[in-house]
Amino acid sequence: MKKILITGGSGFIGTNLIEHLLKKTDAELLTFDINEPKIDSHNRFWKRVDIREYEELREKIVEYKPDIVIHLAARTDLRGLTLKDYDANMTGVSKLLKAIDEAGTVQKAVFASSMYVCEPGYMPKDFEDYAPHTLYGESKVETERRIKKANPSYTWSIIRPTSIWGPWFGEPYDKFFHIVMNRMYFHMGKKACKKTY
């Protein structure tokens, strides 16, 4: 039976991923998050772990011996005032990479980045071409660079989700959909809205 570790398992994507895995696989799951799960039944997989705290992170990963790691833990809002406000994204991935290496059991890993490594409308020339327009985006650029520099020996990939919404979502989409559902949305002008993806 495969062992899957999910960081950020209490977040929007993590919650939906766990629900999907429970329906589609018999893999053994473990989730790390600083927040409690959104769904009570996920408590049996959850451990309160801050990925910036290396010793605890290493201890839990070495003990669990995961085959697969899906790294979703991140600060994703746009309210930070300095790049240091997004330290969980950068320092977190560095410490996770080190702990995974110490475990020596991981065969595959997926690291979540963001479409915000490039500003809306920018078409990157290659995977090293970045144009972030927010501090959050800058933190994800640095996150990607740290992963690439580490060049893990296991199979790995970086994904850049675009705007996503669905069950258990939060800011900013919950506000938008509340406006739409209450018939308070209106579109000004005749031009189409600009898409960022």
Specify the residue positions occupied by each region the protein language model found.
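Conserved Rossmann-fold NAD(P)-dependent oxidoreductase catalytic core, especially the SDR/UDP-sugar
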Residues: 95-135, 149, 157
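SDR active-site strand-loop-helix element
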Residues: 7, 32, 69-73, 109-115, ...
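NAD(P)-dependent short-chain dehydrogenase/reductase
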Residues: 152-197
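NAD(P)H-binding glycine-rich loop region in Rossmannoid oxidoreductase-like domains
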Residues: 51-89, 102, 120-124
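Rossmann-fold cofactor-recognition segment
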Residues: 42-53
